[in-house]
Amino acid sequence: MGVCCSCFKRYEHDQSYPPLLAENEREAISSLLQYLENRSEVDFFTDGPLRALSTLVYSENIDLQRSAALAFAEVTEKDVRPVTRDVLEPILILLQSSDAEVQRAACAALGNLAVNDSNKVLIVNMGGLEPLIRQMMSPNIEVQCNAVGCITNLATQDQNKSKIATSGALIPLTKLAKSKDLRVQRNATGALLNMTHSLENRQELVNAGSVPILVQLLSSTDPDVQYYCTTALSNIAVDEGNRKKLASTEPKLISQLVQLMDSTSPRVQCQATLALRNLASDANYQLEIVRAGGLPNLVTLLNSTHQPLVLAAVACIRNISIHPLNEALIIDAGFLKPLVSLLDYNDNVEIQCHAVSTLRNLAASSERNRLALLESGAVEKCEKLVLNSPISVQSEISACFAILALADDLKMKLLDSNIIEVLLPLTSSENGEVCGNAAAALANLCSRIPDYTIILKNYEQISKFIAKFLNSQNPTFEHIALWTTLQLLESEDETIKAKLKKQINSGEISLNNLTTSTLNNHSDTSNIINNDGEEGEFNDGDDIINLTQQILEMIK
């Protein structure tokens, strides 16, 4: 506050000045000097101190305006709390000044107050955006820096974001993101990031031409700028339309993000990986990330001890693994071992789910991959984990089991691993997806196998699940039960066939209460793995009738 004090004392002792000052201005200076000497006990936002500061603000003397602006800047730096319109009004008046020193200090004061949420809303409601936008375009770097910093703070408040997006602020912010002054660049890219949290605001950002600048700044040497830009682009890539636009206009984006996965800054690594994850929602990007050399970096990140990095990496590889052409490349790049290790993340369900989902994707289309999965210990780990896991993890694991059970060459290996001992309890889950996928896996394991010894050993429980599913009034469950019944009747095991015929004929397994239509909506079974290895309802009522007729024919 020394600057302000010395300025005020100059007016008090220099006899050449008094004629230039009005009486109320002299009184204000005198009062402020007293307040400043006891500043720790003075509330500058009320009564006398605020009146004295306001008097200087409305003075025509530029030196007094500067002193008021500097006083507001220093007071607000040390005392940030909700303020009234009476406090903000003189600061906003100072913001209208053509003097760079007044502008700089007034922007600083407003930026300090804009740390408080209620102040953020009040500043915008009082028309603070328009003068701030003007000051952003000032030729003075200090004014630019403080004005952009204030906008950055204002943009963290949800109520302000759409107003800022449509205020005309985005174009000057985009220009200032290219500033040679690092402080201005950081503030501008931070403000742009704050505008990426809603679809409408992201669209305004795209329309303002911000995306090419954000991509260009990925090559910045400053970790803060890199972080703001990668995070902003990650948010922008959430929208399908934006991903398509990025694909056609930013050919270097993927290679730059892949490089940033190797950054020395963990938060830059994390955001670059999340940006790639969002882009990999599209098939073309799933392939491009692999072509750009992204797999080695992702393997490294999966082995990180920093949990946010692990989560970002496993979410990214999960999306990349969706593309069939990437499956073998991912396995050959050494992903299986770290993915299996991630199943031990009991304190992070999201990591577990992404890891299992990736393993499931890798098993989708290749016998070689499915065998590699089995040999990696993934199935054994899932069997140990599943019964004590949250529903979300059970859902992913049961879907993975259903996919693996489709492979004829793996069925006996799966049965030998005692998978049936976890599938049977899962068929009683209250979650339709979990019990449906477990039942689908069981059904597949009962189909076309050379040895039914394990099935026979567990026949009593298998028949109970069949009976329960046939009485469920759920067409998907009925279809699974009928198909399982048919596979058992078509087996070459006479003991199983005899037991099943007896139960059907006695009504213990009833075919008389089946649905013949799927008009009922069973949303919790829509993601069950069907006989083709895809998510979706099994079949309609016609197939239930056909399966029933085949079964009745076989038990005659």
From Swiss-Prot:
GO CC entries: fungal-type vacuole membrane
Lipid-anchored residues (N-myristoyl glycine): 2
Lipid-bearing positions (S-palmitoyl cysteine): 4-5, 7
GO MF, one example: protein-membrane adaptor activity
Domain of life: Eukaryota
InterPro entries recorded: ARM-like, ARM-type_fold, Armadillo, Vac8
ARM repeats: 38-74, 75-115, 117-156, 158-197, 199-238, 242-281, 283-322, 324-364, 408-447
Record's keyword terms, sorted: Lipoprotein, Membrane, Myristate, Palmitate, Repeat, Vacuole
Transmembrane region(s): none
PROSITE patterns in the cross-refs: ARM_REPEAT (PS50176)
Membrane topology recorded in Swiss-Prot or TrEMBL: Lipid-anchor
Compartment(s) where it occurs, according to its Swiss-Prot or TrEMBL record: Vacuole membrane
Chief localization: membrane
GO terms under biological process: autophagosome assembly; nucleus-vacuole junction assembly
PANTHER family given in the database record: VACUOLAR PROTEIN 8 (PTHR47249:SF1)
Function in brief: Functions in both vacuole inheritance and protein targeting from the cytoplasm to vacuole.
Family statement: Belongs to the beta-catenin family.
Annotated protein name in UniProt: Vacuolar protein 8
